[in-house]
Amino acid sequence: MGNNSTWSQSENLTADKQKEKLQPPSMYNVVLNNDDYTPMEFVIDVLQKFFSYDIERATQLMLTVHYQGKAICGVFSAEVAETKVVQVNRYARENEHPLLCTLEKA
């Protein structure tokens, strides 16, 4: 009987580990923050280029950034969100704009 008890405990531990592994990844909001210098057209370009929005949705989000101070551009896993933030910030600097893209836990 000792062996059956040990086997049962081992199965329970394995089941617990599988449940832990099946948790969905943490998600993060990628956020564009308003500034007084970046042209609206550039923000629209960023939203189309890095987030694949059409012109109408990109314009709506740009106006949200402009009037509300920030807008969520998308919700992604940590790795994808970090990559988007780096890409957008690099693109803004290369084009000499102070546009700031950040991430926050969703």
Swiss-Prot record:
Annotated stretches, region: Disordered: 1-21
InterPro entries xref list: ClpS, ClpS_core, Ribosomal_bL12_C/ClpS-like
SUPFAM superfamilies: ClpS-like
Cited Gene3D superfamilies: 3.30.1390.10
GO BP annotation list: protein catabolic process; proteolysis
Biased composition (Polar residues): 1-13
Function per UniProt: Involved in the modulation of the specificity of the ClpAP-mediated ATP-dependent protein degradation.
UniProt similarity note: Belongs to the ClpS family.
Quaternary assembly: Binds to the N-terminal domain of the chaperone ClpA.
This protein's name: ATP-dependent Clp protease adapter protein ClpS
